[in-house]
Amino acid sequence: MRLLRALLRSASSGSIPQQVDFYSRFSPSPLSMKQFLDFGSENACEKTSFMFLRQELPVRLANIMKEISLLPDNLLRTPSVQLVQSWYVQSLQEILDFKDKSSEDLEAVHSFTDTVIKIRNRHNDVIPTMAQGAIEYKESFGIDPVTSQNVQYFLDRFYMSRISIRMLLNQHSLLFGGKNNPAHPKHIGSIDPSCNVVEVIRDGYESAKILCDLYYMSSPELILEELNVKSPGQPMQVVYVPSHLYHMVFELFKVCNAMRATMEHNADRCIYPPIHVHVTLGNEDLTVKMSDRGGGVPMRKIDRLFNYMYSTAPRPRVETSRATPLAGFGYGLPISRLYAQYFQGDLKLYSLEGYGTDAVIYIKALSTDSIERLPVYNKAAWKHYKANHEADDWCVPSSEPKDMTTFRSI
């Protein structure tokens, strides 16, 4: 709280609250994957990126900052949420410092790139810190269905906004930060124009296999089948961000999902059915289906797997630097779904209780169709936080059947 107040006081000359009000009136400008590629082509211009980001970043920051202010007061008072707010205030102020700088001032342009890198690093722990705030709130005040629904709505939008802001920061810093990536010379920033989907899936499997072997002393094998309908016989390639795809498949593979379920469901038999992955590339979609025989989950629990407030894992320690990112928060699946949805794809789960689960990732096959999905602060969003959620308009079954012998007709 003190840090946030100090930042607001130090920024009073720049009227940060007024700037947030001003920039939140504008809608973010979603970019397609093709536009990201054009920005980072051989003719990439740092000045052009500078002029775009100094306008776009305040809009994206301000839009989500307005939504943060609509959270329950007790959640806003948690130390973790206060810390996240302070990061956003500080980052917005630093971007606004370049509002009146000339794009012809090379020193200012280079200084902007340094600032972008600093902001990117500052926001490294936004996701686990906000998650910690949700845990602090839940432990202190409990959670009711209405608050849970509002927090779920907010966190989906907040984390999607964070993914989009980080994408802009990464692209600019990787392209103009002066450090080339020798391991991926053909990447344009964080984007691979010819992302080999099968290779990324195998990388995700191998990483998850290491964890599974360490914990269970064994692991299910991978059976991968691919079908390129678009270009038969050719490698399965799309324009995509490999780190996003890796995050999704690793999360689905790793110990807390397909591998763990398979190992624990078949522990008595000591025979571990393989995990089947089918990859297809059509004219519109690239689809990855992962199937395990880990026993599945009941239909009523599917939605809970994507609920931020539902996690039953022990409270993690954010300050433990060696911990796996998001370990213990139960955020792996909901964040993975946001990565899929970010460029107009999706991630869905289909479960057969007693048998296993199918997870399906949808990705747009064309770079022109892969367009950012961005939250915008407007009247509809405001109403969602302020609306009174009334009783369900469908009858709710009671836990005990009605005794019809005592029933009287009207």
Question: PLM features: residue spans?
Answer:
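Cytosolic nucleotide-binding catalytic cores of signal-transduction proteins
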Residues: 223-227, 262-265
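Flexible, glycine-/charge-rich segments associated with ATP-binding catalytic modules
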Residues: 2-48, 60, 69-75, 99-103, ...
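Glycine-rich acidic phosphate-binding loop
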Residues: 291-298, 310
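Signal-transmission coiled-coils
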Residues: 16-226, 234-246
